Amino acid sequence: MKQLSSAEVRQLFLDFFKEKGHTIEPSAPLVPNNDPTILWINSGVATMKKYFDGSVIPDNPRMANAQKSIRTNDIENVGKTARHHTFFEMLGNFSIGDYFKEGAIVFAWEFLTSPKWIGFDPDKLYVTVYPEDEEAKTLWREKIGLSDDHIVEIEDNFWDIGIGPSGPDSEIFYDRGPAFGDDASDPELYPGGENERYLEIWNLVFSQFNHNPDGTYTPLPKQNIDTGMGLERMVSIIQDAPTNFETDLFMPIIREVEQIAGVKYGHSQENDVAFKVIADHIRTVAFAIGDGALPSNEGRGYILRRLLRRAVRYAKVLTINEPFMYKLVPVVGKIMNSFYPEVENQTDFIQKVIRTEEERFHETLNEGLAILETILKTAKETNEQVIKGADIFKLYDTFGFPVELTEEYAEDHGLKVDHAGFEAEMKEQRARARAARADVKSMQVQGELLANLTEKSAFVGYNSTEHVSEILYLIQNDTLVDEVAAGNEAQVIFKETPFYAESGGQVADKGTIESETGLAYVEDVQKAPNKQNLHRISVKEGVLKTGDTVKLAVDKVKRRETIKNHTATHLLHRALKDTLGEHVNQAGSLVSPDRLRFDFSHFGQITEEELTKMEEIVNEKIWEQINVVIEEMPIAEAKELGAMALFGEKYGDIVRVVQVGKYSIELCGGVHVRNTADIGLFKIVSETGIGAGTRRIEAVTGKEAYRFVTEQENTLKQAASLLKTTTKETPQKVELLQADLREVKRENESLLSKLASAASADIFESPEEIGGVKVIAKQVNAKDMNQLRQFVDNWKDKKIGGILVLGAVQGDKVNLISAVSEEAIKAGYHAGKLLKEVATRCGGNGGGRPDMAQAGGKNPAELGTALDYVSTWVKEQQA
């Protein structure tokens, strides 16, 4: 067997399929681009869905890739098994309507067994097939020459994820030999069984059916091939490693952890699990952050937080008790740099994010662990088998413990956790539902009509907004028609069109279509599968017919305002990087006639000074009157120029480059101004956070910017008029008013304090004595909780002692406060527990510390009854 590094295996795979006429697709970012059905890119085929469902026709039906992927459905198994990972690479080759079973099988066998490529011993390879797939069985026997004892029929060899493409599959296994299993009585010791001897290395999926919504299966218009080979498994075989973790993909990370911990790998099973968890999780977190994800409390951000905290938990097994994960990022970058330079290129930023997250967790971890240990100890002492949901929630809410982390600690002590109770506790406090867990959703059922419309349509709208063209296709209700009459909507493809199809954030053009017999409006334009511009139209007069000569006219006003915003977006993108750092990446955009919206990755808040600086930079470039140069060139040449690419977008060999002087160079298919002076003015309207690590800037240009500035100026003039001052002196006038207001508030609080002191004599007079404890429970007049707290302060000053509960009505609400003296606390009384009981009796809730608590209620009519309960509660505590 050849001795190969992981990088060599990856490159061999891609070189092989390139030689076989495949286009090598770049690895897509882990954060899906325009695919809300999945949390992460979790397979090679996840980036190919648009080709498999027929919504886009690829330039070359043969494709291959090495795709970084994340799957997190088995996190608890990572580190405890030989092959579970949260981050992995999938090598795949794909055919969209080109070669089918024979081609896929022949390619796979050649790559695995040819001395030019991997060079495996054919006798060590076994395959599994779907029992009804006679074609595949025949190919393996007759084309490849496998004997029947190397072909295993398995009922589960049918790939089906619901509605959409499906079909049988054939898996290839490598026999690692008797050392990995030799028990003839083991019912799982066969290719496809649960064992370590026969390792699955490649899955060939023969996508030949549509799984229809009614549950039936019909042949696909085009048969497809989707294959997947796990790089980590393949490398473990080639490098003769007992598990994936002993390969060159993981061992440098493990060696670095050894240095940090002062503990050796391979001497303790418990320690080895910790090493594996850390090595796996740092790869996932580093790549995910590099691709735009950031730790948070929901969605993919929650996954990152959970992985980091799980790694920190296991690091304690290795006696690592301080932030350290960030130190591993350069190691990950170096291992993967030959094919994935993104981690090494962003090392500083990724380290900063991870270190910040680690430091936050360490601040609360030890305190949380102490509480968890108490909870676990109490559960054992009381023979409870389940950790209560309320306890899990407290650890999650106060100390940042993911419920899964608590569950792992509980499992170590032989206990389970109350998931239902935890969810009940979460329900009231959860403001936003967590994002759906990662799983591949059904692809669309393949459609034939648009995919079969192959006549080319040229876009001529970069330099013209009017054009005479011909109607190639008219489509109504998914059917080709010869004509469309007034009052109907349809889809149209023209021979040439000046109408821009929505893409890259730029909205579609609108406008008119005129023929000798009809008039129609263009409402929207999208890309058809074969890359023609597909126009959605409404016919207003007469009739439009296939073959008609038509005059197409784009709405010039809307187009003019749109292109101002598009070029301004490019300037803003560059200004963001110059101001905040090169880590900023575009996460989405909207370019419309009236505004622009730009979403971008950034870890942290943006200051007013930074916003002002960005706005100034963009306006300076506008006023410099820079020519905008647009040209097509090979992508390699564009990269040499330093052109920025849209994050997550895929590009062909020839790309369109938009250059604003030397300041901004981007790959872009949109329409732009000829000179930055055409933009006129740029004004940021708002800046907000829209999710974990994602910010949004909205801005206006040209006349909309002028209107915005004018509105703000008018508002300032109105404020100045009300303040009886000039616009220039308005800020100073407001400061004086604020100072006056603070003084009035101070005087008011002083007066309220005196009134409270005066009222206290009546409130605290003649406390009830219950079992030697002084108890005061009264309704008082207090305008807010602050005044109630003043009553408590007076009670403490008078050293009355015992228990105090006060309630006040404000409109349709109740404010409650309680206090317990030090002596009463020692006797077992608790202000928080008492007030919780009182509050529930007047429609509220709340709680607090043993010495003081406050709460609210929604039923003022029940306040008297609630306060009467205080005496009952005290007596119950004494019973």
UniProtKB/Swiss-Prot annotation:
GO biological process, one term: alanyl-tRNA aminoacylation
Localisation: Cytoplasm
Annotated Gene Ontology cellular component terms: cytosol
GO molecular function terms noted in the UniProt entry: alanine-tRNA ligase activity; aminoacyl-tRNA deacylase activity; ATP binding; catalytic activity, acting on a protein; transferase activity; tRNA binding; zinc ion binding
Major site of localization recorded for this protein: cytoplasm
Keywords: Aminoacyl-tRNA synthetase, ATP-binding, Cytoplasm, Ligase, Metal-binding, Nucleotide-binding, Protein biosynthesis, RNA-binding, tRNA-binding, Zinc
Cofactor: Zn(2+)
Pfam entry (one): DHHA1
Enzyme Commission number, as recorded: 6.1.1.7
Record flagged with keyword Protein biosynthesis: yes
Catalytic reaction annotation: tRNA(Ala) + L-alanine + ATP = L-alanyl-tRNA(Ala) + AMP + diphosphate
Cofactor: how and how many bound: Binds 1 zinc ion per subunit.
InterPro entries in the cross-refs: aa-tRNA-synth_II/BPL/LPL, Ala-tRNA-lgiase_IIc, Ala-tRNA-ligase_IIc_anticod-bd, Ala-tRNA-synth_IIc_core, Ala-tRNA-synth_IIc_N, Ala-tRNA_ligase, Ala_tRNA_ligase_euk/bac, DHHA1_dom
Cell inner membrane among keywords: no
Family statement drawn from the similarity comment of this UniProt entry: Belongs to the class-II aminoacyl-tRNA synthetase family.
Xref: NCBIfam families: alaS
Domain characteristics, as noted in the entry: Consists of three domains; the N-terminal catalytic domain, the editing domain and the C-terminal C-Ala domain. The editing domain removes incorrectly charged amino acids, while the C-Ala domain, along with tRNA(Ala), serves as a bridge to cooperatively bring together the editing and aminoacylation centers thus stimulating deacylation of misacylated tRNAs.
UniProt xrefs under PANTHER family: ALANINE--TRNA LIGASE, CYTOPLASMIC, ALANYL-TRNA SYNTHETASE
Name of the featured protein: Alanine--tRNA ligase
Protein source organism: Listeria monocytogenes serovar 1/2a (strain ATCC BAA-679 / EGD-e)
